[in-house]
């Protein structure tokens, strides 16, 4: 079986622009925030449902590739499975505070969005009660 090696940029080749581009996608930032929070390697299939949305495996693979090529994660093949870990500690040395700020901002935004969905659900249930 011919398996191509995964590309992991050296720390010196990681750029702020590359990081910001990789994390500009809501699915990728959610994946990355989860990997950082768990501090252990994750099998790609753990992310088939992000933010209550089903994601096809092929799309998920592309998201992981973007994160890996930006230098945010390190991928490791174990048999047929791929496990990913954060390179947060390495990047922190190069760009102190950058990833922490992004992950914290994502957490605030996610909390606000969850509250808005909850509030919208209450409003719609009140409307259906009024209509009955």
Placement of each model-derived feature along the sequence:
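Short amphipathic alpha-helical segments, especially helix-boundary/capping motifs
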Residues: 4-9, 20-23, 38-40, 64-66
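N-terminal helix-turn-helix DNA-binding core of bacterial DNA-binding proteins
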Residues: 18-56, 78-90
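Conserved acidic functional residues
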Residues: 25, 63, 96
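Secondary-structure transition/capping residues
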Residues: 42-43, 55-58, 102, 110-113
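A generic structural-conservation signal
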Residues: 76-77, 101
